[in-house]
């Protein structure tokens, strides 16, 4: 009996090689697609609770819904604006206009693009606990001893600090403005509130402290701090070509006091900003869809 020669293994090996080659090519293609989207660099002010909340929510949406890698860069407000203008940053969601960041806008208006408000109805001024006697900047001198003749501020050079310096002159306040930081100011407020002591701080809304304490702004009859403001999304113009889907999202993204308040309070309560943002996204899928559809 004549035995048939064994079949050559070469065709099988060739097939396997081709299959593996196609698989590798497919994998390379997938990786290329995954890497095709550029990293979006977002500047924010780490000591501002609204900036932290809004930035982390936007970053989570851009990553998970739009598929872009995101890098968050904490900076002082002036450097943040400069970074967007120079193209070192693609965007910020922390531009307070028209008053607080007026000087920055004047300096960089030809190099940035204002997309619109992500939080309307913002406000800056001097904030006091609801139990204090003073009601207005105009009569604050009458109660200055209650406040130990001082106003607790935030970072020197911040817009609200400059306006407070103007207010001290305009109202003839015999009080010292003490620079600190956002977290330090909030800690001072917490200590005074727990002890039922009078305290005046430079502040703003949105801020988690309005959800935690009963506070109010002192009236400003001379309108030193200006009318209501809005927190805007501002981009480097190059983002239009770099990530048009991100720009489209920013044009729709605007949230309400109770929405941002929930994230800010969660962070103040100990949650990591990214975790608080992701939980809010999971609990508000319809709202997120409005911004990304």
Spans of model-derived segments:
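N-terminal secretory signal peptides
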Residues: 1-29, 33
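Ligand-binding cleft/hinge of the Venus flytrap
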Residues: 58-66, 142-178
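A conserved helix-loop-strand patch within extracytoplasmic ligand-binding domains
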Residues: 110-157
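A bilobed periplasmic-binding-protein/Venus flytrap-type ligand-binding module shared by bacterial periplasmic
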Residues: 123-133, 229-242
